[in-house]
Structures are given as C-alpha cells and as structure tokens.
Curated annotation (Swiss-Prot):
Lineage of the species this protein comes from: Eukaryota, Fungi, Dikarya, Ascomycota, Saccharomycotina
UniProt keyword Acyltransferase, yes or no: no
One Pfam family matching this protein: PGAP1
Protein keywords: Endoplasmic reticulum, Glycoprotein, Hydrolase, Membrane, Protein transport, Transmembrane, Transmembrane helix, Transport
Note: Lacks the C- and N-terminal parts of classical GPI inositol-deacylases and may not have GPI inositol-deacylase activity.
Enzyme Commission number(s) from the entry: 3.1.-.-
Location of this chain's protein in the cell: Endoplasmic reticulum membrane
Organism: Yarrowia lipolytica (strain CLIB 122 / E 150) (Yeast)
Record's protein name: Putative GPI inositol-deacylase C
Length: 833
C-alpha cells in the first residue's frame, strides 16, 4: 500500500487564470495507480499547504483516515491537495491572494467533478497547514468564492491574527481585509454569510519555533459558537507540544484530526462544534442534547478519597470526581469504561426536584496522561453531578476543590502548601503575561491520588495536564501577549492533584526564548530607530567636521542612552493607554483600521505591544540590546568597506566634480543611464527591492573607493557616506524576504516577471540619491532635516514591529529630502558666485 498522487489535468486556464502557475492533485492510499479519468466518489477534503509547503504533506493524515475507515467503517474521504510550488506565501501578500483565488477555482472544479460523476456534493472541507490556513480563510472573503461551498476549515499552526513577517505592505492589507471580513460578518447576525461556517485552529505550543502560538487564536475573529482555538498539548491523547512541520505527521495529532474529519460529515454547525470540543478542547465538554431523569433512585455521594460505589445512581453538588475507569482508546466518544465491562456515565444537571433531575447533559470523558498508558477520566461540574454506575469495579474519588490565591515574587518565587483534598486550585492573580515561563516543583504528598498538575488560563483553550518528572514541570501559558487581542484579566491557574508542597519560580532561559519568538522583527525595527537617532546626532554635533558613525554612536551612548531607556519605559506605559493608542493610530501612515467583535478584548499593536509593568521593564533592555546591534552592524559594514578599499589602487585620484558644477549637466552624467535602465526594469519586471539591493551594493563599492582617499578635506564626506551605507545595508534586511520570493519564482516558475512591487516612486529617489553621492555633496542641516530624522526614528519605534515594510519607505522619504537639499546647496552656491 502506498500513496498515489494523481494530477487533476482538467483544471486548466479555462477554469482558472492561475492554472499554469499552480496545480491540483487527488491523493489516495492504494496498491494501484489511480485510474484515469479521476472519478471521486467520497467526501472531498482539500489540503492547502503553507509557506514553502508541499502538497505531499497530506500523506500521513490521508493514510490515517484510510486506516480508521477500514477499521470502523463510515464515509470514505477523497483527499485533494494543492501544489503551490512551495511558494513563500508568508512573505508576500500578492502570493497569498493568488493562492486564495486558485483555491476557490479548485473548489468549484472539484464540486463540478462530483456532479459530473452523479454525486450530490455541495461543499468541500478545507485542511490548511501554516499559511495554508490563512489562505483558506482569505479565500472565503474573495469575490470568486461561491457561498456554501466551504462549511468546515481545519487549520494547523496558522497565524490567523498577526502575519509572521511584516516586511511586505500587501500582506498587512491582506490580513486586515480578511479579518475585517470575518469580524464584520459575525457581528451582523442578520446578514451573516458565514452562519454555516465552523473553523478549528490548532497550535503546536512552545515547540513551534516558526509561528508564535498566540497568533493562532480565533477568539477575537470567530465567536465560540463557530470556532475553536486550542493547543496540541491540551488535546486528549496528544498531550505534547509539536514542531511546526511535525503538525502534519505527528501520529497522535493526525489520528485525532482523522477522527474529527470522519465525524463532522453531514453535521450542522452545532454538531460540528460538539465534535471539535470533544476531540480537541482539552476541557470538560458536554453534549448539546438535554435529557430528563424522572424518579431515579439516587444516593448522595460522600466526600472522600479512594471509595468504591456499588451499582446505581449517585448525585453531588459542586463536587469533583476522579476515577480509574478508562476510556476506550479507539474512540473519543465513549463513556468511562473498564475493560471488565463496568460502565460509568456522568451527567451535569441544571436542577433537582426530589428524585427527578432536569436539563441533564452528558459529560464527555476528559483524559489526562497516565503512567503505563493508563488513563484517568476526570469530571467536574458547578451544578448537580449525576453518576450512573453499572457495577462496582474500581475506585472513585469524590471531593470539593480547594481554592487558593497566591502572591508571587519574581526573584524568590512562591511556595504553597496544598490541602488534604483531591486537588487544590491555586490562582496567581498577578501572573497574566504569556511572555514568562515558570518551573513548578511538587513535593510528594500523602494522597493515594497520583500527582500531576493541570495548568489553565481563561484565554482560549490553554488547558494542559503536566506529569512531574523528578517532581518538576515546565509551565508556560498563553496569557496577555503582545500584538494579540486579549482579555483584560487572564491569570495563571494551577490545579495540583495529589497534595504536597508546590514551589513556582521563573524559568529565565525559557522566558528569553519567549521574548525572541515574539520580538524577532523588533530587533530589526528598533535598531533602525536608533540609527536614525544617531544620524540626527551627527547633524547636530556642533563641530566643523561631520562626525564618523563610531564617534556619534559613542556620543549617543554617553549622553542619550540613559535618557532613551527612560523614554522607552515611558512610551511603553503610554502606549498601554487606549487614548494614546487611538491618537497614534490617527496619525499613523498608512492608517490601519480594525473591526472588533467583542469590546472586552484589548489590542495593543504599538511599540512593544504591551501594557502595564512588563513593557516598562522590557523597553530599556531592548533599547540597550538594539544599541549593541547598531555597534555590531556598524563595525561589520565599516570592516567590509575597509577591506574593499584595499582593492583600489592608492594612486587613483578621485574625479574632481566640483560643487560648482552645473546641476543640469550633473543629471546628464552617464550614471543616470544606469538609473534609467533600472527604473524601466522595475516598472516591467523587477521588484523595487532588487533595485534597492543593487543600489546598496553600488554604495558599498563607492564608499570603499572614497575611503581609499585619505585627504583630510574628504573626511567629512567619507563619514557621511559611511552612515548612509550602514542605513541602506540595514534596510536591505527589510527588503530581503520579498526579494527571496522573486528569486524563488525565477527558480521554480522560470519567470522574471513579478506580480507586485513595481512602484517606481518607492525606489527612484533612492537611486538618484545614491547617484548624487558620487558628487561628494553633504547637505546642510536644517530644522526640517532634523524633524524628518526624528519622525523616521519615532515611526520605526512606534510602528516598526507591525509595519516593518515602512522602514524602507522611511529611508526613501529621507533620501528624497537629502537629495533636494544637496541640489539646493549647489543652486545657492552658483547663484552667489
């Protein structure tokens, strides 16, 4: 048995304008080749690969569905997969739009195939990995989507809320458009085109080092009646974090996905969501169906550990139950059951009158990891708990939960003694930040209950069971995190089973990893802000000579670094205020708007994206670190230009284009031919990021050439051009991802034509500015120059994390002004001569 991939050759340019760029496959586990023509007959599921992903990634889930179908029967599933040629969709908004458009075309063609085969199939289930999940949701918002053709979307490690990279302005627009469409539809209950849509979003947790798991949450986009967000380590029978790529082939997870796929077929919204909650939520779930029990011979339960219940009905109020009745490992929908045949059913009942119970809903098994593959089922309820025990077989513990609230010190941690009950629920009201990880030590208790810890918070379905290893568990939760809509209060809760003393301390190494995952782009935008601030220092140093970048950096560190750190703390605090955020969004260029469903959510997408104390503490640390990065990049660029300068002959003298030259004739210089050619290519073929990279390379060579001239009168200009060289080199990092998309298109699609980024205005001023530097002109400082440098620095500071692409445009604007000031100086001097 192997997996065969059969191309759907009928999907041509007649059905999609992108058919020559992308393709569609039917995937099937079979000992034979798939016969042609392809005649699908099952339930269609379409796999959408993510960034640099392959259509072949669906193999594992497809094979698991086949195994379950052969074992238990049910509807056969036909898996289709899209081949996007492993495009970098996470880096390029236009690529996302193209993939979403082709996805809709593929859906329409698949449904037509079923109709041609005499099958009444009206919709396709989508399974998206990484950016494939974003493409799946984006496709619903496009004009070529036919309503009702998609009703269920599974997404794995998909960053729904925040793009993983903000180096492209188009991708920001795509995210805003997509999320605004979904939010506005669910906000308008009378005209909701998504009323029959259900979405599942699964994150890999801390082991996913590609996409921060906080970005997968659908809470602020899709209401809980239509969407579920969860983590792999919260899912029954998975119980572990999963690497980004492994989300598609991890055995435990793909089995649960296959179970869900087979059980959501032909169900309405409520039925699909019930399946999602039972299989994936990691929290206690109830059936939607209610039933009443009349005249039940019921016995009140007694609190106590390690007791056995005879056959019959029992009830309790506000109690918690633990039992070693296990759950059939082959199904997620069975009751608590022993291999000997004894059965335990649990119900949550809304009311009790005598021996009658009203509004009872079945409590589905909640599983936690156990030793030797044993499983403990756990049920708790805030109403009446009704138990139906078929026979006395094994022990059941029934007790109330002990509640405790604990303070926490970030230096010394906290130690709590648990009570002599089944479990103790410890809340930490001040621990709300998802950026901090902890280590929890649990001493041996005296209970007969095996020790383990349940960790949960009120944000999404972040509930997991942790079994201590040598008495220690690692705790990291998804509380208040930067740039993601969050509830005002989402503290950490630990429920400790088995008694003993609990000690919790900060995991500093794990916390550093959390910071790096969330602030990778900040370490590009914040050094940019500091570079522009240092450039401002150079213009206002008050010396006759233009200072070198090393000298001005030293001045910045000695005079302004402490002030900058304090200012960073103040800015972090101010951006936590909604009034300040509203004002900064009002003056933001470009203006971004978001449409929120629930007013209880707060979103801070400025500076560090944090509110409260954490931002004021992190701001100085990041400022110092970014200053160190500026020193490092300065030394690297200066070292490179010094090395290149040795390649030029020392006897070569620079051409003496005097500042008194006619500026009109300057424009007619032969180097303008190169600028003209590049401009035409940008308009027709190349992204402007390539032109910027070429200009940076030319500037590096020019800087090295001028450095070979040791004339004292040229030192100021050498310092000036060196600063520009460092700025452009750093800005190239912003442009590199889009450039990588273009190069990948050349390699895979054999086409040099790019689908976006042909705006000549975004690059022509920079090209002319670099060309003008060959005339060795230093523009004079002015108040407007200072204001522009200050604005560019502050823009990088406030908006750089979420709009890194604007760093390029900020430099382009500065280049425009410096170019004008350079020629103004020439005209002014010519006039006086």
């Amino acid at each position: 048995m192997w997996v065969a991939y059969s191309p759907i050759e009928g999907l041509t340019t007649e059905h999609s304008r992108l058919a020559e760029k992308y393709s569609l496959y039917l995937v099937k586990s079979t000992p034979y080749d798939i016969p042609l023509p392809v005649r699908p007959s099952g339930v269609p599921v379409l796999f959408v690969p993510g960034n640099a992903g392959s259509y072949r990634q669906i193999r594992s889930i497809s094979d698991t569905c086949r195994e379950l179908n052969e074992q238990y029967g049910g509807s056969e599933i036909d898996f289709f997969a899209l081949d996007f040629n492993e495009a970098y969709s996470a880096l390029h908004g236009r690529t996302l739009l193209d993939q979403a458009e082709y996805l809709n075309d593929a859906i329409n063609y698949i449904l037509q195939m079923y109709r041609d085969n005499g099958k009444d199939v009206s919709s396709v289930m989508l399974l998206g990995h990484s950016m494939g999940g974003v493409v799946s949701r984006l496709a619903i918002s496009l004009d070529n989507y036919k309503p009702g053709t998609v009703t269920t979307i599974f997404t794995l490690a998909s960053p729904h809320l925040v793009p993983p990279a903000t180096f492209d302005g188009d991708i920001q627009k795509v995210y805003n458009r997509m999320n605004d469409f979904w939010r506005s539809n669910y906000a308008d209950s009378d005209n909701n085109s998504l009323s029959d849509m259900t979405v599942l979003s699964i994150a890999g947790g801390k082991r996913d080092t590609m996409v921060p798991s906080d970005y997968i949450s659908l809470d602020s986009v899709v209401p809980s009646s239509h969407g579920l967000s969860t983590f792999s380590n919260s899912i029954n029978r998975v119980w572990t974090g999963i690497d980004h790529d492994a989300m598609m082939w991890c055995h435990q997870l793909r089995r649960q996905i296959a179970i869900a796929l087979m059980n959501v077929i032909d169900r309405d919204v409520n039925g699909r969501m019930e399946v999602f909650r039972k299989v994936f939520s990691g929290t206690q779930t109830l059936s939607d169906a209610e039933e009443d029990f009349e005249d039940v011979e019921v016995t009140p339960v007694k609190h106590g550990l390690h007791q056995k219940l005879e056959s019959g009905w029992y009830y309790g109020e506000n109690v918690q139950v633990m039992t070693t009745h296990t759950v059939n490992q082959e199904s997620a929908f069975e009751s608590y059951e022993m291999s000997s045949g004894s059965l335990l059913r649990a119900f949550e009942c809304r009311s009790k009158s005598g021996s009658s119970f009203k509004g009872c809903r079945k409590i589905f098994p909640l599983l936690v990891p156990g030793s030797n593959d044993a499983v403990i089922a756990f049920a708790e309820t805030e109403h009446y708990l009704l138990l139906d025990v078929s026979s006395s077989s094994d022990w059941i513990s029934i007790d109330q939960v002990s509640q405790k609230s604990a303070s926490f010190d970030f230096v010394t941690g906290a130690t709590i003694s648990t009570s002599n009950t089944i479990s103790t629920d410890i809340s930490f009201p001040k621990l709300t930040s998802g950026l901090v990880s902890y280590k929890v030590s649990v001493s041996k208790g005296v209970q007969l209950v095996r020790q383990y810890v349940q960790q949960n918070s009120s944000r999404v379905y972040d509930s997991k069971y942790l079994v201590p290893h040598n008495g220690v568990v690692d705790v990291s939760f998804h509380g208040d995190v930067p740039f993601v809509p969050y509830f005002q209060s989402s503290p950490l809760h630990l429920q400790v089973f088995g008694g003993g003393h609990v000690t919790i301390r900060v995991d500093w190494i794990g916390s550093l990893g959390n910071l790096f995952m969330r602030y990778r782009i900040l370490f590009i935008s914040l050094p940019s802000a500091i570079l522009y601030a240092i450039f401002l220092v150079q213009f206002h140093a008050g010396t006759a000579r233009f200072l070198s970048l090393r000298q001005s950096t030293s001045i910045f560190i000695n005079r302004y670094l402490l002030t900058s750190c304090l200012a960073g703390s103040g800015i972090a605090y101010l951006t936590g205020l909604s009034q300040v955020r509203d004002f900064l969004h009002l003056i933001q260029i470009p203006i971004t708007k978001t449409f929120a469903v629930d007013p209880s959510y707060t979103k801070n997408d400025l500076f560090l994206g944090l509110s409260g104390v954490s931002g004021t503490v992190l701001a100085p640390i990041f400022t110092v670190f970014s200053t160190g990065m500026v020193v490092l990049i300065t030394e690297l660029v200066m070292g490179l230009t010094s090395l290149l300068s040795f390649c030029f002959k020392s006897t070569t003298t620079a051409q003496s284009e005097s500042e008194s030259g006619d500026p009109i004739s300057d424009l007619l210089h032969k180097r303008t031919v190169f600028v003209a050619v590049i401009s035409v290519l940008v308009l027709l073929f190349f992204p402007y990021q390539l032109a910027f990279t070429l200009a940076t390379v030319a500037l590096l060579v020019m800087t090295a050439y001028f450095k070979s001239n040791k004339a004292p009168q040229e030192q100021s200009f050498n310092n000036y051009i060196s600063t520009i060289c460092v700025l452009m080199t750093w800005t190239c990092i912003i442009n590199a991802p889009v450039l990588a998309v273009w190069i990948q298109g050349i390699v895979v699609q054999r086409s040099m034509t790019f689908s976006s980024h042909h705006n000549l205005v975004s690059i022509l001023p920079t090209l002319l500015f670099v060309e003008n530097l060959s005339f060795r002109r230093i523009p004079s400082g002015s108040s407007i120059t200072s204001l522009l440098l200050a604005y560019t620095s502050l823009h990088c500071l406030f908006y750089g994390m979420m709009q890194a692409f604007m760093i390029h445009h900020g430099f382009n604007l500065l280049a425009t002004w410096l170019l004008c000031m350079s020629y103004k100086k020439v005209f002014f001097k010519s006039k006086h001569e």
